[in-house]
Curated annotation (Swiss-Prot):
Gene3D superfamilies: 3.30.230.10. Keywords: Ribonucleoprotein, Ribosomal protein. This is Small ribosomal subunit protein uS9. GO terms for cellular component: cytosolic small ribosomal subunit. It comes from Polaromonas sp. (strain JS666 / ATCC BAA-500). Coiled coil: none annotated. Belongs to the universal ribosomal protein uS9 family.
Amino acid sequence: MIGEWNNGTGRRKSSVARVFIKKGTGKITINDRDIQVFFGRETSIMICRQPLFLTNHVETFDIMVNVHGGGESGQAGAVRHGITRALIDYDATLKPALSQAGFVTRDAREVERKKVGFRSARRRKQFSKR
């Protein structure tokens, strides 16, 4: 399996996606389900396919993804990051275009932790003057 497949690992928020690509017809499978079934929102599907549209490889590769953790938005971002890394593993000349679009850089934004004495990360308890 390793010989014919190129792989990449993508991360976003608390989601991790392991992506495997090989020459094929453009079928994307996420956790043994079609991408249309796995992601309900069209926006998430578009986010996943962005690197393929940018490099004109929409119907060139069959993509198999294992993703876990986080929610729909984080998983879509993790899949996009993983597909980008797998494309670079397949053809390193694609890296400048993908990097220019900002797909190579891992989005480092994480949820800020809740602080003691606050209701959430930054929201304080209501102040009562009297």
